Regions:
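Nucleotide-activated donor-binding/catalytic signature segment of Leloir-type glycosyltransferases, i.e.
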Residues: 248-268
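Acidic donor-binding loop of glycosyltransferase active sites
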Residues: 276-291, 304
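A charged, aromatic-enriched C-terminal amphipathic alpha-helix characteristic of glycosyltransferases
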Residues: 344-381
Length: 392
């Protein structure tokens, strides 16, 4: 298993507690199932559609429900846990069969942003069912609990937007967690070599998929303001392109400022390389619509200089100017970066304070996903779960 910790770490913690897990793996695309140290072939049940294209995508949830029903009839299971809204049919099947079950919800931010622009009533409900079918259904169906990440997902606001009664299940809205080095990674400011392997003071990074909510175009504008002031920085946009509109906005901003040759789109990179891009830049930029996301936790934990826009999404963690840089306009952001470039000792202090903040305030992977694993186990065994916080 690979990907974000939220997708695999709960399984890791459950296995460490002695649980046995079978995985129902489903995709409308051709995939190969590979064994791992923890999951043998008999633990991996692959579900494929019978048809290709749109028809295969439509029939896949029905196959998932059928496979879930077959598994639950064939042997005893204590719990069914659906990862992402695509698992709705499996969780729904378990609920109908009286098996304790829950859903880990993802992908709600865009849905909330889109639906709140539509007048409440049947038009909003119809759009939700049409464009966000399984998120909408999963929010209305019975289960023991639903868990969403309190990182700008807006899953809490979505209930009010849709007018959904939460009483059909417990709703948990918890912060995410990342792997934070116990010791601050050392950056050699005098090392010789090429970025991102070594520090380059005239490099900036923006880590994350190119998407509307990430606002890479704002980073390009900051770069443009630096060039207008005579500082030839380079900007590295590290992440896959998931929005053609944002990709075009970046190109347009680069053309407007005449900095196209200084904007580098690297595509998707391994996590270790992403950390290099962040750590070995003068600063890593977070100018998104909402910045309390995994990458914020990760780059702070790496002891990076983070430059974020003043949208208050990370206010609870930052001491402005001491562990993070905050700006209101792109011109102000450029001025702050120039000042930082000319004060290496201050940059080192900000890096040290960022890492200290991460150690003292962020949830570790073990604590956060240990809580999730224990919640699953307590729910499966019928124990009282009233002591689990609804919001972290």
């Amino acid at each position: 298993l690979s990907g974000l910790p939220a997708f695999y770490y709960p399984f890791k913690m459950l296995l460490a507690r002695g649980c046995t897990i079978d995985l129902l793996l489903y995709s409308s695309e051709p995939k190969t199932v590979v064994e791992s140290a923890h999951f043998r072939r008999e633990n991996l049940i692959q579900i494929r559609p019978r048809h290709r294209g749109a028809l295969g995508t439509l029939e896949l949830p029905l196959h998932l429900a059928h496979a879930t029903r077959q598994c639950l009839r064939a042997r005893h299971y204590d719990f069914v846990y659906g990862m992402t809204e695509g698992s709705h049919m499996a969780v729904r099947t378990a609920a109908h069969m009286g098996i304790p079950c829950a859903l880990r919800q993802f992908g709600t931010q865009e849905m909330a942003n889109v639906l709140e622009t539509i007048p409440s009533g049947w038009r909003r409900q119809l759009r939700a069912l049409k464009d966000y079918t399984y998120i909408t259904l999963s929010m209305r169906s019975r289960k023991n609990f639903l868990l969403a990440t309190n990182d700008g997902s807006r899953a809490d606001a979505l209930y009010d937007i849709l007018g959904v009664d939460r009483k059909k299940f417990a709703f948990y809205f918890w912060h995410s967690a990342v792997n934070i080095p116990a010791q601050q990674p050392i950056v050699d400011m005098d090392a010789q070599g090429s970025y991102p392997q070594v520090f380059q003071p005239l490099c900036l990074s923006h880590i994350g998929r190119i998407a509307d909510v990430k606002r890479q175009d704002r980073s390009v504008r900051i770069l443009g303001e630096l060039h207008r002031r005579g500082y030839p920085f380079h900007l590295y946009l590290v992440g896959e392109k998931s929005s053609e509109a944002m990709y075009r906005a970046c190109l347009d901003a680069a053309a407007e400022y005449g900095v196209a040759d200084y904007v580098h789109m690297t595509g998707n990179q391994p996590q270790s390389v992403c950390r290099q891009y962040a750590r070995n830049a003068l600063a890593t930029l977070l100018p998104g619509e909402w910045n309390r996301v995994n990458i914020f936790y990760e780059v702070m934990g790496e002891g990076c200089v983070v430059l974020t826009n003043n949208n208050h999404s990370v206010d609870e963690f930052i001491d402005r100017g001491n562990n993070c840089l905050v700006y209101d306009t792109e011109a102000e952001a450029a001025e702050q970066l120039i000042a930082l470039l000319n004060d290496p000792q201050r940059a080192q202090r900000i890096r040290a304070n960022a890492h200290r903040t991460a150690i003292e305030q962020f949830l570790t992977l073990e604590k956060r996903f240990g809580m999730e694993a224990q919640l699953v186990m307590d729910t499966a065994s019928g124990r009282d779960t009233a002591h689990y916080p609804e919001i972290i």
